[in-house]
Every structure is written in structure tokens, then in C-alpha cells.
Amino acid sequence: MQVWRVNLRERSLEREAAPEAWSRLGGRGLSARILLDEVPATCEPLGPHNKMVLAPGLLVGHMLSSCDRLSFGAKSPMTRGIKEANAGGSTGLHMTNLGMQALIIEGQMPRDGRGASGWWLLHLSLDGARFEPADDIAGLGVNETASRLLKRYGDKVAIALIGPAGEMLLSAAGIQNLDKDRVPSRIAARGGLGAVMGSKRLKAIIFDDAGGQKPPIANREAFRQAQKLFNKNTLDHPQTKAYQEYGTPAMVRTCNAFGGLPTRNFSSGQFEGAETISGEHMRDLLLRRGGESETTHACMLGCVIQCSNTYGGEDGKAIVSPLEYETIGLLGSNLGIADLDTVARMNQEVSDLGLDTIDMGAALGVAAEAGLMQFGDGERALQLLAEIRKGTPLGRILGHGAAMAGRVLGVLRVPVVKGQAMSAYEPRAIKGTGTTYVTSPQGADHTAGNTIRAKVDHLDAKANIATSRAAQINMAGFDSLGACIFAGFGFMVNPEVIPD
């Protein structure tokens, strides 16, 4: 496996042998190592000295369920510290087929004599790197951009791309990836890494793995035995069965019962309309509607959990894919909205802009606190999201996330840690996750170490310190393997399958 290093200023590609010290690093572990070694801690996140690292997990490409995730890393314009966000989809798989252990993108595209650099596509294949103008798709939403690129390059490629939010360098912008059905629905959402990509004037990265090979396995027989055990443990786990039925929205009832469902700008942890936005209600609704609706859907090839979904409207036509728990919590209950159709429309708009639904839900909650909308008013929320697409001053304030919205609008209740919005787990009710928010270098991020499933008194702060620490260590390991958080169901039953 190699490290591919792209220098944007020189428009060059170097393929380097990965150091031996990196042989057991992948995903978050590898991106963190590279950033710590190569990026000045005091650099401007949107300046030329910041680097963007794409690192597939160690298990990516080996046909393990839920283990094809890709980590994106950079210094964050939101937290101002080291940041990793990961996503499912097909990009990591294509990278490993091309022999990439990591892709490092450094510098910025040079400007012409008028100070303009335009927008660019980076095309990567076994033949090397190619830079192509992208001004014809600048300003387009994620869905239209992906559609045009697939027509141009064919449906066999993988694509990592940004939407208008990334082009505007908004701090809540993420990086979208294609799922197994070629839909740009898998976003590395958190921390503003889409803005970092935008600062480098890259609209999209195209990965063409034609002629590539699957990554090598040192001991194929041992791997197969561990694979069988992992697959069995994953399939047999009761949580897998719950997610196969209801997906991540199954957490709505659970968190509401805990008092951990963010409600009206985190002023409460229980929502009177929780039942109408629950996973159980959504499943019944989608089954009745049929058409393009899917109650379960895999974002990666071969995933047995299939916790994703496609949310169809009354006519059965898809509105958005996926509609996840975090989005329901932040764009639903956190805004006092109890209608899934409205939440789905908001989700679609946020995703097409290339924004993080968590930070957008929190930013709109702050806007409601400031009097710019009433809690429960979904149409007004959609109007505020339209301000972002227009690029108005108000839209840019909201697009920078909840922390910026709070500072500009003078709101004191702002649910952020290290500048990043809290996920849909109220920290006063789930204190282990709250401890993770506070102690993780990544800020408020449930994927850094969520403790909701721990067998502990969630209201006992001291008892949850060790719980949070263990969860953070486990998640760092899963992120380095390229494993979805739910793949942990299989690993934690028999942890020995990992070293095997």
C-alpha cells in the first residue's frame, strides 16, 4: 500500500511507500498521525499550510460487514483543532483498490493574474492524477453535481464532493460520498472539513479504480476464520436486529425515555411529539407509502445491519436518503417539529447544500431562541435554510454553525463544545456522552465515544468517567479499522477477532 501525495500548487502527484511505522495505522489513527507530523498546530485551517488527509480504515476492502468507512482529517475551521470525520459509501473501497493507504492533499490551487483560481476536479486512477476545470458545476447542489459527474466519468467511479456550503467556506460544511447505489448520501459531516476542501478550490475528487486490486491479506485462512466469527456475532446481536427493523431512528423512543432527546434548543430532554418522529412510526409510514421508500438500506456493499433508509413522501417518491436519528433529533425535536415529512424536506435541503444536519439543527435552535423563528414552525426553518443557499449574510451566519449563530445573535444557550454542536444525546441525562463531549479533542461528537448503551447509572457523573474513557478508546480503534460504530456489536462480543 502507498501514500499518494497531491500538491495542488504544483499540480503534482507523488506515490510513496508507506513507512513501516504506519503498517498498523488506518482511518482516524493514520490521519491523526499525519496531521500531527505535518501540519503546524497554529496554521489557519483555511490557509495553504493545512492539509486534508483521506485514510481508509485497515479493514476496508476486505468484505467485512460495515467495515468500509473512510476517514477525512484536517485542522478544523470549527473547533480550531485536529479533526476527523468519517463516512460510509464507496470512496474508501476505491482507494484501497488503487493501493492507497492514505491520500494527502496539500497546498492550494494557484491563482491567476487576476487573483482567481476557479474550481477544479481532481481525477485519480492508476494512471496518476489529472486536474480538470469544474467551473461548469460550481454552485450546484450535491445531487446535481454528482449526477453530472457520473454522466461524465461513468457509474463505476467513486466521488468525494462538496456542495455550495463548502464553496462558501462555511464552517458546518461536510464532504459527501456516493453510497452503493451511486447516491451522494454519505457525508463526513462534522467539523467543517468541506470548507477545508473548498479552501483548496476542489469541487470534487474522482476515484477510478479500473485495473485495481483488492488489498492484500497476510494470512488468508486466519482472516476467514475471524471473518466468520465476526459476521456471526454481528448478525446474532440483538441491537443488529433492532436496527434492521427501524434503523437509527429506533433511538428516538430510547432517548426520550432517558430524558436525553434534545428538545427546543436543548432546553428539555423529552418531547411530547416523540412518538410521531420515532423509528417505529417511520417504519409503519414508509411501509404504507411504498414506492421508492425503503425502511432499511445499506450504505456500504455487504452490510448486514442496513441501518439506513430512503424516506418517501405521500406519493412514494424519495425525498431524502437517509433520514437518521441525529437528524430527527436536531431538525425535529430540537426545533419542536413533530412532522417527519417536514424533517425530511429540511434534511434534503441541508444535505444538498453539503452541510452537517447536526450543526444546522443546533443553529436553527439558536435562531429560534433569538426570535428568528418559532419552535415548531417548519416552513420558517426551510426559509432560513434557503438563506444559506442564497449566500445572504444571515445564511452565512447560520451556515457557520451554532457557535457562530450564538455569538452573532447574542444567544446565551448555545449547545456546543469546542465550537461544535452537540449531537442528539442530551448530556445532562446521558452524562457519559457528556463527558466525551467535554474531553474529546474533537468537541461535541457522539461518534467519539457514545455511552448510551452502557450498563451504568447515566445520571451519575463520576461513574461515567471510566465509561466515557473506555468508549473513546474503543471508538478510536473502530475508526482506525474503518468499522461503523455498529460493527462494534460484532467486535465487542469477541474482541480477539481484531488481533486475529
Annotated model-derived regions:
Residues 1-194, 199-214, 220-239, 252-274:
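Protein-protein interaction/assembly regions in multi-subunit complexes
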Residues 13, 150, 157-159, 164-500:
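Extended C-terminal regions of large enzymes
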